[in-house]
């Protein structure tokens, strides 16, 4: 029984030594040839960040456009810019009419 344990342990040790040697023996000799997944991710992230941040000229152009044309809410159902003033006036007039009707109903009761 002791011999079997010794043989199993020695086989595991030999296996791990061979595994370690094979993993350390890579064909990559130059750092340029080593393109790991982290290098690819870092490169793509850097390209994304460079393309994401606008330069100063683009920011100035956007500010000028925003100053010339104030932002408008686009109605999702119609696709045209909303006129909030008319919408709010319509709501207020409906509320006033409803209040008048409620007051008249209360006076009648």
Swiss-Prot record:
Stretches of Low complexity bias are at: 54-72
Record keywords: Glycoprotein, Secreted, Signal
Give GO cellular component annotations, separated by semicolons: extracellular region
Region of interest called Disordered, as start-end residue ranges on this chain: 45-109
Segments crossing the lipid bilayer:
none
- Which subcellular locations apply to this protein? Secreted
The glycosylation sites are: 27
- Kindly indicate where the leader peptide sits in this chain: 1-23
**Composition bias type Basic and acidic residues, residue spans:** 94-103
Its protein name is: Putative uncharacterized protein DDB_G0282065
Q: Which organism is it from?
A: Dictyostelium discoideum
